Amino acid sequence: GKGKSTFCSYIVGYRHDYDGSVLFDTTCAKNLSVDQWVDLRRAHISYLFQELRLFPELTAWENVAIKNNLTGFQKESVLKEWFERLGVADKLDAKIGHMSFGQQQRVAMIRALAQPFDFVVVDEPISHLDDDNAAIMADIMMCEAHRQGAGVIVTSIGKHMKLDYEKTFKL
């Protein structure tokens, strides 16, 4: 109830019911067309939703492949390495709806990283992870952000990603 998810939805353009301005370069977000938002989200902003928004009837691999097929960005071998590191390689063919929320969070992070981005926005990314998996997820995310020269925006309440934050803001 502090507005963290709402803040994220302003940044990625899912909500426009705010005062003030959100600018991309010098363009006001409220003035972007649907097509411009699609392009922005496909190539510049990746978003890991708090509620994940995975397709429960699809497998873990299919959920990631949908994004990767749209962007053609990551090599399949890289994605499978991330599945392995995050302990969900044995779930590639499992339906998302049959996986725990923590397993789903790991799959959703892999999906979020399966595209180019200037910023990755992650909303409560480790709420259902143990410390080991949270650390692995943070490492994968930061390595990929560094590789792409991208920024990272993280929201959390309670469980925080252990990162070397440049700036923090409390809402």
Show where each model-derived region lies.
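Helix-to-loop junction immediately C-terminal to a conserved catalytic motif
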Residues: V12
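Short coil-to-helix segment of the ABC ATPase nucleotide-binding domain corresponding to the Q-loop/switch region
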Residues: L58-A65
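Catalytic Walker B motif of ABC-type/P-loop ATPase nucleotide-binding domains
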Residues: V120-E124
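Conserved ABC ATPase signature
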Residues: K95-Q103
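Conserved ABC ATPase "signature" region
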Residues: E76-K91
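Conserved ABC transporter NBD signature motif
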Residues: G20-A29
